[in-house]
Amino acid sequence: SYVGIEVPNPNTSLVKLRPMLESDAFQQMSSPLAFALGKDVSGQPVVADLVRMPHLLIAGTTGSGKSVCITAITACLIMNNTPQNLRIAMLDPKMVELMRFNGVPHLLGKVETDHDRMQGVLKWALMEMDNRYRLLEDAHARDLVTYNRKQERKKLTTLPRIVLIIDELADLMMTSP
């Protein structure tokens, strides 16, 4: 048996995104929603697939790199997908971290900062999810890949993946009923 104890390292090391994206670990991921998270304790790239984790919560203390992580994930998603294949909705209650993505063609509108409009975006996302479940059911498709494959065979319109990114969810929850 082993016991592992994590000790903060006073000597931080910079993890650059490009080498992560060029790593074998990332290149071997075939998913359009693959993203690089960083390096493990032995310096090996850590990659993940948003398809396998449809809900992701990034938590940590102030200054621990949550927003940097969200930015890296978003950059990976944008670089691996066209705006026709991936649409992103972003909510930023603090009006700070996600504003840099305004103007990116993958966005469904602009980065939303108004609390009332954020409620509208969340309601739209729920309606869109329900609508997509009905479409999948009608097409006898288990997932979006199968649905789109069937649509392509019939030369019909496919659906893009939709990713909703919320920075500072706690702030949004505190100000919304």
Model-derived regions: residue spans:
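Conserved alpha-helical scaffold flanking the Walker A/P-loop in AAA+ ATPase domains
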Residues: 121-124, 146-157
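Short, charged/polar, Gly/Pro-enriched secondary-structure boundary elements
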Residues: 10-17
